[in-house]
Amino acid sequence: MYKSVITEMKAHMEKSVEDLRKEYQRIRTGRASTSLLDEVKVDYYGNPSSLSQVATLAVPEPRTITITPWESKMIGPIEKAILNANLGLTPGNDGKLIRLNLPPLTEERRKEIVKGMKKMDEDHKVAVRNIRRKAIDDLKKMEKDKSITEDELKKAEKEVQTVTDSIIAKLDEILAHKEKEVMEV
């Protein structure tokens, strides 16, 4: 009976882990990655479209991203969209493709990025703890309604804590990996 509460809780917690991964993908490290441009929207005949829908993105060198528009007249709107996205990148074009050179990050900027990442990590941990609290409240309500016994409640609470601990360990692992990547010179 209580397994459904734990299954639902686990699904919500896993979503929180995935959200953190996605947020970290958008963080600029010393290495070029096309995921930096995931949120860039280009005005394509009046419709906001993602960059990958109007151009081919590639990483030919560790600090360079190239964007090859499928239509040459899209170079201007793509450059404008990149500048408006405030990524700290200046596009340069040769008429056929746009080149983004990522300058190396300063030590100070790296520390700022890590500080922001730690805040994101903490926000996700708070979300996980809130999910845990809701699950425990649901379990206590089930016990109060006599849907589960007191022994089942204790067993379920232990299981909830075990799942929560493993999810928080996952969040810490993701942070440690990304922090290492950012601090790498």
From Swiss-Prot:
Coiled coil: none annotated. One of its GO terms (biological process) is cytoplasmic translational termination. Keywords: Cytoplasm, Protein biosynthesis. It is found in: Cytoplasm. GO terms for molecular function: ribosomal large subunit binding. Gene3D superfamilies: 3.30.1360.40, Ribosome-recycling factor. It comes from the Bacteria. GO terms for cellular component: cytosol. InterPro entries: Ribosome_recyc_fac, Ribosome_recyc_fac_dom, RRF_sf. Its main location: cytoplasm. Pfam families: RRF (PF01765). Transmembrane segments: none annotated. The keyword 4Fe-4S does not apply. Belongs to the RRF family. Responsible for the release of ribosomes from messenger RNA at the termination of protein biosynthesis. May increase the efficiency of translation by recycling ribosomes from one round of translation to another. PANTHER family: MITOCHONDRIAL RIBOSOME RECYCLING FACTOR PSEUDO 1, RIBOSOME RECYCLING FACTOR. NCBIfam families: frr (TIGR00496). This is Ribosome-recycling factor.
